[in-house]
């Protein structure tokens, strides 16, 4: 299944090139935000802001926890964490982001996963950030050693949620409202599923939607 992507770019530019690459279509323009679509289904929302000295790249993958199968709860969120570590050709993703002085993060919800960077607006930084997002989507390294390290981070996040009355309440309400739908399950998943997920399964799929190649 093809993964739907949305790239949201906020640029500090005085003008935007009006000549589109072959196959790219301009879909709509509202309130200064213009939508473009590439032949592969990638959608780009471009928002030029001449007063802003920063550039923001927000990559949205329209796959989230509701796409997880039985025994896969928490895999979308765990994969988001893995997407900040390393590529198969040795790029250290988080280290690169920090070295460029970017404000960055990633989040997982029921319907989507997103990754973003905000950094000084230069052509070099924009090219680097787009290249990084491409590498993150198709070339992330997933193996048992990296998974074991990141599981410590995810496990701590899980335990913090267990001690949050607000999160416990929201999870109880959701599970009652959506008895037979993944909207009723926690995005971070269950401890049982998280503790037993093998690297091969995480790398192969999240709800049979995102494919990876395991080295």
Language model feature labels by segment:
Residues 12-14:
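N-terminal signal peptide c-region/cleavage motif recognized by signal peptidases
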Residues 2-8:
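Sec-dependent signal peptide recognition
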Residues 7, 80-83, 153, 160:
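Hydrophobic side chains within alpha-helical segments
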Residues 5, 17-95, 116-121, 127-133, ...:
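His/Glu-rich zincin catalytic helix
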Residues 10, 55, 83-86, 139, ...:
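A ubiquitous, low-specificity "background" feature that marks scattered single residues
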Residues 37, 42, 92-215:
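Charge-rich, well-structured scaffold segments of protease-associated domains
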